[in-house]
Amino acid sequence: ALPISGGKLVVRPPEGITFKPEENIIIGNVALYGATSGKAFVSGVAGERFCVRNSGAVAVVEGVGDHGCEYMTGGTVVVLGQTGKNFAAGMTGGIAYVLDENWDFYQRVNKETVSLEPVEHKYDVATLKELIREHVELTGSPRGKEILDDFSEFLPKFKKVLPYDYDHMLRVIASMEERGLDGEQAQIEAFYAVQKNK
């Protein structure tokens, strides 16, 4: 297990390799378990249970095994490739952006607590692009560079994974901000509004 709390973790294969990082596991199972903050950039695939119980870290990886983002409560995860089964089981917070080139991700995501949406909102697009850019800058990822170089073609293939409760809260916060409340006050009022309606 490799939890992080702050800082920046960069994992990349050594120079001169003859395999494609995006097709090979480079970090094992339960990496970033219980991570609370910081950033991780992995040029390659993670094993099973990647970012389980992540509560605030940001991670970019090029594929994950089974049970990725399980019980995640916060943070952001970008997956630039395939996932295993049962992705996002019990996920109640945070956001994941998953590249779904074969249009079959819906078969591997656990839809009990999350929805799948296209990445269309300007904030999501900017966040996704910036994280991929940072990933390429730090790891030299060929896969990341390929996606960045043709971003407008790849963007429609990404899915945003968002927990239902979290999505509802974000919408209530946005409506409070539209009424003129600033960020923190909007969050407080949204919390009370949601609690009142339970």
Please name every model-derived segment:
Residues 1-198:
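Long, distal/terminal scaffolding or interaction modules
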